[in-house]
Amino acid sequence: MLINLLPDFFAVLNSTDRIAAYLRYFDNHRSLLEAYWVNYVVEPESPHFSEVVKSAALAGRNDLRTMLERMDVVTLARNAEDQCRNLLEIDSDIDVVLMVGVGAANAGELVVNGRAVAFVCLEHFTSVANPETRGLGLDPELIPLWLSHEISHGVRYTSPGSRSEMKTHIQEANGFYSYWETGKRTTLRELLINEGIAVQVSRMISPGHASWEYYGYDRREYARIREMGPVVARSLIGNFDKTGLGLRLKYLSDGMSEDARRIGDYVLPDRCGYYIGARMVEQAMATRGAAWTVRASAAEIAAVSGEAAATA
C-alpha cells in the first residue's frame, strides 16, 4: 500500500511554528516515524532529537518543491510497487512510503508490528545537493531503483514463504526489525545475501542506470571496490557464519573508521559487501528467479552457485 506523507510534511512547512508542527506530525505518524528515527537517525528520547527536528523543520526546501513540480513521484512509486508485486510474487503486506526525512538514509526498510515498510526520503532526490537539508542530490529517476531495493527486503523479512534468517529474528522480536539488534544476531552470510538480492532486484525493476548507482557508490568508489574484490573476498573466509554488529558495520555501512575496516595492509572500502553480496546471488537469480531467491535461505542460495565461485 502506498502511503504519501508529503502533504502532511508540507503542512509543517506552511505552519507559523514549524517545530511544534513537526512534533505534531511525528506524533500523528509515531509508529512509522519512531521506527525511522530509531533505526536511521537517533533515539527520539535522545538530547539530539530536538536539534535534528529544528534543523529539518527550518531548512529551506526550494530544491524539493522544484523537483515535485516536474516529477510525478506518486506514479513513479506506484509503478515500482506494481512491478515488484509481479516480479517477486508478493504475498505479504508491504507499505511503500514517500516521505521527507531529516537528511539521514536516502531509503530504507522497516518492519513494524509484523508489517514491512519500504521508504524513500525525497530530500535526497532533487538532483541538487543541499547542505542545509543534507540532501544527496540524487536524480529522482532513481526512486524506483531504491524503492525496489527496499521492497525486496520487505518480502524477505515477512513473506510466509521466506526461509531467511532475517525473518526468523524479526519474528523472535515480536515482528520488529532493528538495524542494530537484528543485525548483530544475523550471520554475515545472510547479511551479504540480503543486500545482494536487493541490488539484483533493483537492476531488474529499474534497468539502464550506471552500474555503480545500484550499490549506492559513486564511479570512483565502484572502481576501487571492483579492484579490491579479491581482497574483500579473502577477508570473508571463515567469517560467513559469524555474527556481530561489527561485521555488518565493516562490510555494509558507511562512516566506519579506517582502523575498523582494516584487513592486514588493506582498508576495505565502505559498503563493499553490497558488491560481494550481489555476486553471491547472481547464479540463483539467473537459474531460480527473483521470487524464489528473495525467499530462499542463505544456505539454499549458496548451494545453487557455490560460495567459493561467487566470491572468487
Feature-to-residue mapping (PLM):
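Post-HEXXH active-site segment of zinc metalloproteases
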Residues: 157-194
